[in-house]
Amino acid sequence: MRINPTTSGSGVSTLEKKNPGRVVQIIGPVLDVAFPPGKMPNIYNALVVQGRDSVGQPINVACEVQQLLGNNRVRAVAMSATEGLTRGMEVIDTGAPISVPVGGATLGRIFNVLGEPVDNLGPVDTSTTSPIHRSAPAFIQLDTKLSIFETGIKVVDLLAPYRRGGKIGLFGGAGVGKTVLIMELINNIAKAHGGVSVFGGVGERTREGNDLYMEMKESGVINEENIAESKVALVYGQMNEPPGARMRVGLTALTMAEYFRDVNEQDVLLFIDNIFRFVQAGSEVSALLGRMPSAVGYQPTLSTEMGSLQERITSTKEGSITSIQAVYVPADDLTDPAPATTFAHLDATTVLSRGLAAKGIYPAVDPLDSTSTMLQPRIVGEEHYETAQRVKQTLQRYKELQDIIAILGLDELSEEDRLLVARARKIERFLSQPFFVAEVFTGSPGKYVGLAETIRGFQLILSGELDGLPEQAFYLVGNIDEATAKAMNLEMESNLKK
């Protein structure tokens, strides 16, 4: 964080040192600070507590002003641990909100909520910073055209397409391929759209954050040899951090993404894992500030806080921020205020299925549970819409027949249903796809499949033109031509064995 926007580096101007405040009360991560008359800081201003603890170690704790209490006192929330702070310590008003580094120098690096690098790779090589609190783009700046954000992933583009500048909820448990799907999206946006990504780890486990970083380095999303060629910036506020840091880390990631959109005019992917932790941290801070709790103990400002974050995630005439947010649903209760407030902002949902992952079908996106507001004929066109609906109908009918097949066997079905089951199994396998970021694990080259190719492939399966091909020919291939080539290879191999 730049302590004072009018000075270079992290220095504090002498003018500010003439009127420092003093800590008068500390309750956990909440501090009350008294300032001289007429020198009160504004709401959201960053304060810095400076001094030494009982063993002589220097203290430098950043806080954010949340309330003006009267009698020249303010209440602030600390962004790091408050151990060692004592009453009477000097507090400096920086005169501005928390500001974080932005631009290309952030790619390949890991930051905390204050924009300080935490990856031991030295300081960030940029003088450009931006405050984390800002207004959402004005309506006149918005790009109101509805356009599909092509990901190159067949199951997503066909059945639950993402909106450019939209918000997508990602639902999935542990071990179903959520991280790999996130990394593939980061890789594909860099290749197809020349875009970059920002990953905001909001209240996630430190181990998971470290695993993600290591996997990104392994798959090439973060380039260790030339860090400037990396495709993603990481911002972490883990579970063990104070609630103030977890509440604001999402805004830090969003601020970095906004710079790529507004100044570099790029398409940006913003990942937030987990949006529920943002709400949870806000609830903790609200209670610490003494606000009356609302439904189920959540903060009374839940909708306002969620709206102020989500409304900044949008398309403008310069570029777009498309956000993919992991959503934790407490006790699987979709009516809980936290997920219910999140759903109001989502354009699409991508649901990962443990059943599909168990079958080895990756990405394990559930084609029947995943939804999108973009799947309308007037937006995607009649051809795309009809193909998607027929694919869903075929898979739904197959799902209904599975109990009969399990009890009586496939032979008891009518000829028509047997044909439908065969096509559904081919569709299910054709929805799988080899990923670029999984090449190092699978040995199979990744595939980016354009939307037109995806639609053509599923139309050929539905029309019955490919009924003669074995279903394993459709497993983990790119477009439909690769499936027919794979079928020929399988036939040649079986002939050689004979």
Curated annotation (Swiss-Prot):
EC numbers on record: 7.1.2.2
Give the GO biological process terms.
proton motive force-driven mitochondrial ATP synthesis
- PROSITE patterns membership: ATPASE_ALPHA_BETA
UniProt keyword terms in alphabetical order = ATP synthesis, ATP-binding, CF(1), Chloroplast, Hydrogen ion transport, Ion transport, Membrane, Nucleotide-binding, Plastid, Thylakoid, Translocase, Transport
Locations listed in the record:
Plastid, Chloroplast thylakoid membrane
Which GO molecular-function terms appear in the entry?
ATP binding; ATP hydrolysis activity; proton-transporting ATP synthase activity, rotational mechanism
User: A Pfam family matched by this chain, by name?
Assistant: ATP-synt_ab_N
Protein family according to the UniProt entry = Belongs to the ATPase alpha/beta chains family.
Q: How does it assemble?
A: F-type ATPases have 2 components, CF(1) - the catalytic core - and CF(0) - the membrane proton channel. CF(1) has five subunits: alpha(3), beta(3), gamma(1), delta(1), epsilon(1). CF(0) has four main subunits: a(1), b(1), b'(1) and c(9-12).
Specify the protein name. ATP synthase subunit beta, chloroplastic
What is the species listed in this Swiss-Prot or TrEMBL entry? Answer: Nicotiana sylvestris
Its gene is: atpB
